[in-house]
């Protein structure tokens, strides 16, 4: 479980991250990261989008739990005030935990590299 202050809940936060943040996609996942320099004292916040295309409720919740456990390890490395949205593709329903972790690692490295470059 992610800490309460690290969870993204408001629709407006999701919209801002998706519209203004950097995007990186792979076969199983797409990530959107927005680093906001003005909110450095706030913790990074993470939200998950797992649509009905992924599967029924049990499958969607399973994918969301897996992603949450993987993303928890990235929280300390994210800049303060950043917004991260992780969107699962339908293939994520049948993927192994290791495959999800590997793809998320690639997505995160791409996103962080793009955002750090944009801040310079």
Q: Where are each of the predicted segments found?
A:
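Positively charged, solvent-exposed patches that mediate nucleic-acid binding
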Residues: 1-120
């Amino acid at each position: 479980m992610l800490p309460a202050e690290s969870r993204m809940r408001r629709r407006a936060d999701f919209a801002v991250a998706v519209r203004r943040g950097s995007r990186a996609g792979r076969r199983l996942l797409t990530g959107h990261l927005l680093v906001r320099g003005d909110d450095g004292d706030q913790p990074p916040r993470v939200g998950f989008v797992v649509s009905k295309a992924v599967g029924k409720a049990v499958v969607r919740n399973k994918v969301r739990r897996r992603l949450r456990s993987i993303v928890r390890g990235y929280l300390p490395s994210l800049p303060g005030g950043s917004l991260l949205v992780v969107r699962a593709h339908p293939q994520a329903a049948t993927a192994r935990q290791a495959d999800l972790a590997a793809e998320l690692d690639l997505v995160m490295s791409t996103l962080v590299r793009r955002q750090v470059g944009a801040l310079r």
